[in-house]
Design a protein with these regions (language model features):
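HDAC/HDAC-like amidohydrolase catalytic core signature
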Residues: 1-206
Length: 206
């Protein structure tokens, strides 16, 4: 961004630490307590083959959620037209009761719930364009008619979910699996022919 001259057009904000109550918007207290209790004082604790906790993992995860919620505040309150959160760890693989795929808390799902709870936003849409399918976000949105999840991702690939047939309880899930080697043309087609019509039908507020 600095090299291309965009840095001066950005307003930088440090990630604030989310309260644990925010995490509870999408994860049950038992799960939160398990994560907190699993954070080691040194070394690492493995939650699965891919996902581990180090002494700083909880702080990083809470700041990732805090950044996303602050971004929601800025956009909903009209302080910014858009926002980008450069945060780790990622979140889209974390399910309601399960950390996986390097993800501890589902950052974007929590931010969607935060927008609804804090600001009264009714309908929230999330588009995921990672190479891996966001199974956790899909699981959390599956049965909520006011949440919409769209994803472009490579299949077959971890975590193995994300087929076109996975539509959600209210047709609020849109999956556009791509194959290895697909490029910009296929990606644009998925957006224009599948995801945008789905968004137009859903009519999100955010």
């Amino acid at each position: 961004l600095q090299r291309e001259g965009f840095d001066g057009r950005l307003v930088r904000r440090d990630a604030e630490r989310a309260e644990l109550d925010f995490i509870g918007l999408m994860h049950p207290q038992k799960y939160i307590d398990q994560i907190v209790a699993s954070v080691p004082s040194s070394g690492i604790t493995r939650l699965d083959a891919d996902t581990c906790l180090s002494p700083g993992s909880l702080e990083a995860a809470l700041r990732a959620v805090g950044a996303a919620c602050s971004a929601v505040d800025a956009v909903v309150l009209g302080e910014s037209k858009n926002a980008f959160c450069a945060v780790r760890p990622p979140g889209h693989h974390a399910e309601t009761n399960q950390a996986m795929g390097f993800c501890i808390f589902n950052t974007v799902a929590i931010a969607a719930a935060y927008a609804r709870r804090r600001h009264g936003v009714e309908r929230v849409a999330v588009m995921d364009f990672d190479v891996h399918h966001g199974n956790g976000t899909q699981e959390m949105f599956w049965s909520d008619q006011n949440l919409f999840f769209a994803s472009t991702h490579q299949m077959p690939l971890y975590p193995g979910t994300g087929s076109k047939s996975e539509r959600g309880e209210f047709d609020n899930i849109v999956n556009c699996p791509l194959i290895a080697g697909d490029g910009s043309s296929e990606f644009r087609t998925a957006i224009s022919d599948v995801i945008l019509p789905g968004l137009e039908t859903f009519q999100p507020d955010l």
